[in-house]
Amino acid sequence: AESTVKQAPVXAVAKAYNDYEEYSLGPEGLKDAMEXTGSNALVMD
């Protein structure tokens, strides 16, 4: 099976986290963040 998960270097992940900190954690905020980042999964600490 083919994987569609995009791999990103840690530096890019850290930058994305900083860039998208303003998103809320509600359903709409997560939806907006996933659309804006082009990711199909968000990992939050």
From Swiss-Prot:
GO MF terms held by the record: toxin activity
Superkingdom assignment: Bacteria
Keywords recorded for this protein, A-Z: Enterotoxin, Toxin, Virulence
Keyword Transmembrane: no
Subunit comment: One of 3 components (of 35, 45 and 105 kDa) of the enterotoxin.
Miscellaneous comment: This strain was isolated from a food poisoning outbreak in Norway in 1995.
Protein name: Enterotoxin
